[in-house]
């Protein structure tokens, strides 16, 4: 009977400990759950394009989970899930040389183009949530919603914006020194 009581105390302690970790999400747990790769690239392009490093990391995580080889069914490529047509336009704006789709497989180029695009959207909309909505659903959709005096009309895009905002807080807390805070 004493062994059973001791076992129940141990199990209860483990369950309570696990609940504490899941609920409080200490930085070590967040780092295990939400990795940060390509730190120098993220920090460098965040600085170059006046982006909050945690925001850039959050977008990358949401788009690709830091998988440089990620591909979407819509044809988006790489860490920041850029469409080739969008990236080609960005290459022209940034003075890049001849654009090749394979450039998007390069983490440095992908994050550079994605950072430029995110900065462009932030400047255009003057609002982080609208910029994130445009990153996810496209500028045309956001412009249409705004012209009609409406908010974000796609539930997927509302979820995307909320998720990136949450991830930004996670990355800011878990990787403060790595991201230069």
Each model region followed by its residue ranges:
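Catalytic glycan-binding domains that act on GlcNAc-containing polysaccharides
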Residues: 19-181
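Hydrophobic membrane-insertion alpha-helices, especially the h-region
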Residues: 4-21
């Amino acid at each position: 009977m004493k062994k059973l009581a001791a076992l129940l105390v141990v199990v209860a302690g483990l369950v309570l400990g696990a609940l504490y970790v899941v609920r409080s999400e200490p930085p070590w747990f967040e780092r295990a759950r939400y990795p940060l790769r390509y730190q120098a690239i993220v920090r460098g392009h965040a600085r170059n394009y006046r982006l909050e490093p945690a925001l850039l990391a959050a977008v990358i995580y949401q788009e690709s989970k830091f998988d440089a080889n990620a591909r979407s069914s819509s044809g988006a490529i790489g860490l920041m899930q850029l469409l080739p047509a969008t990236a080609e336009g960005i290459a022209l704006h940034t003075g890049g040389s001849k654009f090749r789709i394979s450039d998007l497989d390069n983490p440095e180029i992908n994050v550079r183009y994605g950072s430029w695009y995110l900065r462009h959207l932030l400047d255009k909309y003057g609002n982080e949530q609208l910029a994130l909505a445009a990153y996810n659903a496209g500028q045309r959709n956001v412009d249409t919603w705004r012209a009609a005096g409406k908010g974000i009309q796609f539930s997927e895009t509302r979820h995307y914006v909320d998720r990136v905002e949450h991830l930004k807080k996670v990355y800011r807390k878990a990787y403060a020194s790595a991201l230069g805070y």
